[in-house]
Amino acid sequence: MTDLREKKRTAFFRGHSAERFASVLLLLKGFRIVARRYRTRLGEIDLIARRGNLILIVEVKARSSLEAAHLAVTPQAMRRIEAAADLWLQRQPDHARLSLRFDLIAVLPRRWPKHVPAFFTSGNY
């Protein structure tokens, strides 16, 4: 196996592990996980969680520091996440009652994940 293929494979499994860890954090906070790795033609959402009428659109980043996790979410990624969230929301029968929030969960080495509520807002990148 080539080095590049091995790096991609490692990153893939690290990402899955980080998303599972982030899911546990959200469950402990009283959220229900509605979708994992929600894919559309416009983009992908790592996690969608719900508590009441609040919907969290969550980007999960496994990085060495909180700053590195912040920097890993580019304005282009934010636009794709928002576009995917809009498509998901349109498909919900109770979409008029729902409030969306775009959060970041940074999974850091040997620490509990850091939840950053309202990491970005719609249209503000």
UniProtKB/Swiss-Prot annotation:
Source organism superkingdom: Bacteria
Gene3D superfamilies named among the record's database cross-references: 3.40.1350.10
Family: Belongs to the UPF0102 family.
Lineage: Bacteria, Pseudomonadati, Pseudomonadota, Alphaproteobacteria, Hyphomicrobiales
Protein's name in the database: UPF0102 protein Oant_0187
GO MF: nucleic acid binding
